[in-house]
A protein has these predicted regions:
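Nucleotide-activated donor-binding/catalytic signature segment of Leloir-type glycosyltransferases, i.e.
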Residues: 70-89
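Aromatic "clamp/platform" in nucleotide-sugar-dependent glycosyltransferases that forms part
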Residues: 109
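A short helix/loop element that forms part of the nucleotide-sugar donor recognition site in Leloir-type
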Residues: 3-19, 73
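Short alpha-helical donor nucleotide-sugar binding micro-motif in glycosyltransferases
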Residues: 88-89, 96-101
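Conserved donor-binding/catalytic core segment of Leloir-type glycosyltransferases
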Residues: 20-36, 42-45
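Short hydrophobic beta-strand element within catalytic cores of glycosyltransferases
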Residues: 126-129
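A short, well-ordered alpha-helix in the C-terminal region of glycosyltransferases
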Residues: 154, 161, 168-182, 189-195
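Conserved acidic donor-binding segment of nucleotide-sugar-dependent glycosyltransferases
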Residues: 141-142, 146-153, 161-167
Length: 198
């Protein structure tokens, strides 16, 4: 929850990761693999860096050998100072990493159900995701976030649109928090289950 975050700790983390130099942070949490759309995200970021030098990407998760990213993408992640890759992060700290993000991006090709999107929405982050199985049910389009295709140019354009409009980001973020509260909090899910069996 956003209200649980200690701002002093958040600022310390921001400085430690080198994100204090940037005014806009694109966030991702999950495995750093092809299936999650990381190739498209890094390619989109290359496009965005030509427009602005105050944007960063925060990748929270592990590089994996299964479904591994191509070497040129890995090298870009490892050498671009505006791409921060954290590796594994303890669950108890994850909300602080969401707290550093301005938007959350999941350009995935397939998901069971993207809990990372729900976590990000509960932290009042606007979402950019695809219409892949699972992802399609995780947002309300143009209310809590935006859908994109598996295309770096379209992804860059959508991120730039949100970067330029703080009011829309704020609106989507607040609506996303309500969407999660009303549909995915534990007591709501238990009520739905009870209705099925009573």
């Amino acid at each position: 929850m956003k209200e649980n975050i200690n701002n002093v700790q958040l600022n310390i983390l921001k400085r430690r990761l080198g994100l204090d130099k940037y005014s806009f942070v694109i966030g991702f949490t999950g495995r750093l693999v092809r299936d999650k759309g990381i190739i498209e995200l890094i390619q989109a970021f290359d496009i965005l860096q030509k427009k602005s030098n105050d944007i960063a990407v925060l990748l929270v998760g592990m590089l994996e050998t299964r479904d591994a990213l191509p070497q040129n993408i890995v090298e870009n992640i490892e050498t671009n100072p505006a791409i921060v890759s954290t590796g594994y992060v303890e669950n108890s700290m994850i909300e602080y990493y969401y707290g550093l993000m301005d938007i959350f991006v999941l350009p995935s090709y397939r998901e069971g159900f993207p809990t990372s999107v729900l976590e990000a929405s509960s932290m009042e982050l606007p979402i950019v995701t695809t219409k892949a199985t699972g992802c399609i049910d995780s947002i309300v389009e143009k209310e809590t976030g935006l859908f994109v295709g598996h295309n770096a140019g379209e992804l860059a354009e959508t991120i730039w649109l949100l970067r330029q409009d703080g009011d829309i980001r704020n609106k989507y973020g607040k609506a996303g928090r309500e969407f999660v509260k009303n549909n995915f909090e534990q007591h709501v899910i238990w009520q739905e289950i009870e209705m099925l069996y009573v």
